[in-house]
Amino acid sequence: MPIVTANGIRLYYEETGAGVPLVFVHEFAGDAQSWHLQVRFFARRYRTIAFNARGYPPSDVPTDGTAYSQDHAVEDIRGLLDALRIDRAHICGLSMGGYATLHFGLRHPERALSLVVAGCGYGSVATDRAQFHRDVSATAERFLTEPMATLADVYCQGPTRVQFRDKDPKGWQEFHDQFAAQSALGHGLTMRGVQLTRPSVYELEAQLERLTVPTLIVTGDEDEPCLEPGIFLKRKIATSGLVVIPKAGHTINLEEPEAFNRAVLDFLTAVDAGRWVRRNPASETGSAILPSNKTNPSS
């Protein structure tokens, strides 16, 4: 079983393919297996690495709640790269993994060839922030006191998951069953330590405006909690592009794998070829007609 030790935590990982490294960072309800449709596709071109976060067996499940935080999630990505002797890599994350990917790019931009930030921003909108904290607190407590199978039934039928269930019942059932087999303790402590305490993307505005790593933002148009944050990220990261997948919810890499893979491949191809450039400031104007007085620094 492939294991690396990062920051004192044993992390399980799966590696397939050869070439430029491409690291996949999973969502709260997933694990390395959640990326199987991407690994099969991208391993033909890249050295793909998918790993289980701390709290997700066979990675370690620390019992100390202080072992879980957004900072730990970021440093585990760095620790994984260090352990595998990878200097720089493309980093692709969904949801919780999208947050970790974004923060990794902000903290360690020299280690990231590019960032794919998918389904990111849940709990960021100011008017929804209090409800988000109430929901997360209550759900974390349930993970720590109720059977994992019960929580999987609830979590996998949320308003941004029903799209996946309706389109692909078999795929959704596999996703549900994998989730139900995970660690309730790991999920409860992850929800308390990561989701409950992480900053809103709107709090990162100044850092986002300084980010120069090529970034692709991907969201489903029925993933309501992530739509507005996705547009915000696009506007603040000058080197970003935004893809909105129609009639899609939160689990976009499994729900719409062909659209997701194609968007990511086109992005990575452009980055690898040096053709992904920062936004022309002249396009940043509220007018649809009158030109901006800003100039393109690359011209």
Regions found by a protein language model. Give the residues of each.
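Catalytic active-site module of serine/aspartate enzymes centered on a nucleophile-bearing elbow/loop
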Residues: 240-299
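Active-site loop/oxyanion-hole signature of alpha/beta-hydrolase fold enzymes
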Residues: 40-43, 49-96, 262-265
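Acidic beta-to-alpha connecting loop that harbors the catalytic carboxylate
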Residues: 18, 221-223, 247-249
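Conserved alpha/beta-hydrolase catalytic His-Asp/Glu region
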Residues: 126-131, 145-207
